[in-house]
Amino acid sequence: MIISKKSLPRRTFLRGVGATVALPLLDAMVPSMTALAQTPAAPVRRLGFVYIPMGSDISRWTPPGESGALTALSSTLSPLEPVMKHVTILSNMELRNAYPGTHATSNAAFLSAAKAKWTESSDYYLGTTVDQIAAQQMGQETQLPSLELSMDLMEVVGQCDNGYACVYQNNLSWSSPTTPLPSEAHPRVVFERLFGEGGSSADRRKALGKRASLLDWVREDIARLQKQLGSADRSKMTEYLDTVREVERRIEKAEAQTFDNPLPDLDRPVGVPAAYEDHAKLMFDLQVLALQGDITRVITFQLARETSNRSYPEIGVADPHHPTSHHGGDPEKVAKIAKINQFHVSLFAYFLEKLKAVPEGNGTLLDNALYLYGSGMGNPNIHNHVDLPIVVAGGAAGRVRAGRHIKYSEPAPLANLHLTMLDAVGVRLESFQDSTGKIDTLYSPVGLAG
């Protein structure tokens, strides 16, 4: 793409008292008569990770056939049908440093590929996770180096699982072997991290009481910038701001029950949607906004916590997840686990379709992103860490070839995938934990130079 016009800086913001709104990539951000790929406005690569707890029923997860083009999906993965050409399924991946087979080590090793120190005290020790290795390089140019999200309040401390400290299953991201990064489950807090600026709890309390929109604080900047843009960019900016407002309204709806009561401390606001699906979709939509506005390029999201006793009555599973996962081969319980697995996949598919719907440069936001979806546990009934449920989605701006099934005859280290994903987004490492090499079949045949 070559655009002939004056350009705006890629990092253009709408600013007002208490708000800063980053903008998506606009045509006006491309310098006159310059190829898009040769400008600071060239589409950037994003890296994300979504964790699901307690493995899967792998018999209903694995696609039919051997390695090659992904031509059919399993029942559990069927929600990915609309984006099938954008995903790759990897079968027979192993997380060797997650043994001796606990929930805590499953979560801890998923992004670190490291062995957690066995302790229930504060002398915990793990390893820097792959997302934080990426953030050290990819986060230098963004408002937030990385964004850590979850669906559960991580307030349990002490010993959680077989003598392992709760910190191991509470936190996906570690910026160093001794520094876990807490995640955020409150949509309002995430929204304010992305778009809020300054202001005290009292200021936000006053704004909430008036049902004021954050966009009201940047109206003057919106009007000023609209005059500088062409019609296509005006439409793109309006659509983006409409999405910001729509997400804000959904947060307000969840908070509505608090308006008739004394407001709590807004440094830790309540207002999480009552329905799990609504909450998850809201958290995914916040990720879309964060990536589209280039607020961050690295995200982790824990869809549920290991040992979660959450039930899913909306899909006909009233029994708690964790006890059900110890199914003992009971066909009824196995079917319930498969239902939960498919439900979680459907939420990820929702997110991928949202990314696919956002045009960016010569492609879409999904084309420029690279996401790993999966678990650190394989079979939850026996707590093993082989044949993990793993999906890779996106194209990393042309570096990754999707629409494939990669099936190993012998277990392959998950660290190989981490190493490959880092390489695909431009972060070069010789090795990562127990990696034995990169996954060449994941790369685009176009090549990875640059």
Q: What positions do the PLM features span?
A:
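Ligand-binding pockets and gating/stacking loops
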Residues: M1-G450
